[in-house]
Regions:
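C-terminal segments of enzyme domains that contribute to small-molecule binding surfaces
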Residues: 2, 94-95, 102-132, 164-222
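Flexible, glycine/small-residue-enriched loop-and-beta-strand segment within the central core
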Residues: 20, 30, 37-132
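Conserved G/P- and acidic residue-centered "switch" motifs that form tight phosphate/ATP-binding loops
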Residues: 144, 162
Length: 222
């Protein structure tokens, strides 16, 4: 048995409800970092089919999810093709039904409202049944409360919740957030990460601050 979880394994534990997400993704426009997991008691491996909605890669939008993210059951990402044309009199998608309708009203991607990519940082916790809309960027260390609808960007290490999701609080002070962003613990090799785990799980933020400062000092001296 390996000393550390294998990021290339679909099911990292014996429960079968949690999968390391990058290993079940096939769409060319979806990227998921190491150790990010999706938890679902039914079919966690069907994430791409059930949780990434209206994903048409030819549309050009990307879904990028960082490392060590915790994605709860029912979280969904609404991709750009979900948006209807709003610049014309009717918003109805006539062309998708084929035949004469498609000939008379051919689809024009440039007429659709383009919101851009969905980008989720590292160590982000997305609560159960939350919905992330097109064009949203969620920063490192952020938390999205259960059943929230995220319509706008979320700053690193903040907590948002509601429909639409609103700022609830900043998790830490600016200095500690800057330290975390500089250390970027999610990029450490497994051996170094294991040594840092007591710090990452310590509620004593003063001790955490000292430890992270020491990490940066050691890096600067090598």
């Amino acid at each position: 048995m390996s000393r550390y979880p294998d990021p290339n394994q679909v099911f990292p534990n014996e429960y079968g409800a949690t999968c390391f997400l990058k290993n079940v993704i096939t769409a060319p426009n979806i990227t998921v970092g190491d150790y990010t997991y999706y938890d679902d008691a039914q079919t966690p491996t069907d994430f791409e089919k059930n949780n990434v909605l209206f994903n048409w890669p030819e549309f050009g939008d990307q879904l990028v999810i960082g490392k060590f993210c915790s994605i709860a059951s029912g979280v969904q990402f609404l991709m750009g093709p979900a948006n209807h044309r709003i610049s014309s009199v009717s918003t109805y998608p006539f062309s998708v039904f084929g035949g004469t309708w498609a000939q008379k009203a051919p689809p024009h991607l440039d007429q659709l409202p383009r919101k851009g990519d969905i980008v989720v940082g590292n160590d982000v916790w997305l609560g159960r049944d939350s919905l992330i809309l097109p064009g949203v960027t969620i920063g490192d260390g952020a938390i999205v409360a259960a059943r929230s609808v995220v319509t706008r960007d979320v700053a690193p290490y903040t907590v948002v919740g509601g429909d639409p999701a609103r700022f609830l609080k900043q998790r830490f002070d600016d200095e500690l957030i800057q330290l975390l962003e500089e250390v970027r613990w999610w990029d450490l090799p497994p051996e170094e990460l294991a040594e840092l785990l007591p710090v990452l799980c310590d509620p004593d933020l003063k001790a955490v601050r000292r430890a992270l400062t020491a990490v940066l000092a050691r890096r600067a001296s090598t």
